[in-house]
Amino acid sequence: MPKQKIRIRLKAFDHAILDQSAQKIVETAKRTGAEVSGPIPLPTKREVITILRAPHKYKDSREQFEIKTHKRLIDILNPTPKTVDALMKLDLPSGVDIEIKL
């Protein structure tokens, strides 16, 4: 019988909230008897936006803004029904995007 695996990908702009959420997921999974691999840090996506400071001319005067998207990967091996139920009831911050694959 093949082993079952749950893969959880977390994304957030703030790395501190992301790490707290990952830690909550890992603690919950371990407490319910599943094996956990991770959190594995994935490459951070850095998006830079350049705009003109002045509304009409002065093209040499520009300003740059950047936004970083931090990502983490968690694999839960051999999850029990209790593990799945506990993960569904877990309350995580609103700034974290969660993608779950079975």
From Swiss-Prot:
GO CC annotations, alphabetized: ribonucleoprotein complex; ribosome
Record keywords, A-Z: Ribonucleoprotein, Ribosomal protein
GO molecular function (one): tRNA binding
Pfam short name (any one): Ribosomal_S10
Domain of life of the source: Bacteria
One GO-annotated biological process of the protein: translation
Glycoprotein among keywords: no
PROSITE patterns linked: RIBOSOMAL_S10
Function according to Swiss-Prot or TrEMBL: Involved in the binding of tRNA to the ribosomes.
Quaternary structure (record): Part of the 30S ribosomal subunit.
Matching HAMAP family: Ribosomal_uS10
Similarity remark: Belongs to the universal ribosomal protein uS10 family.
Protein name: Small ribosomal subunit protein uS10
Gene name tied to this protein: rpsJ
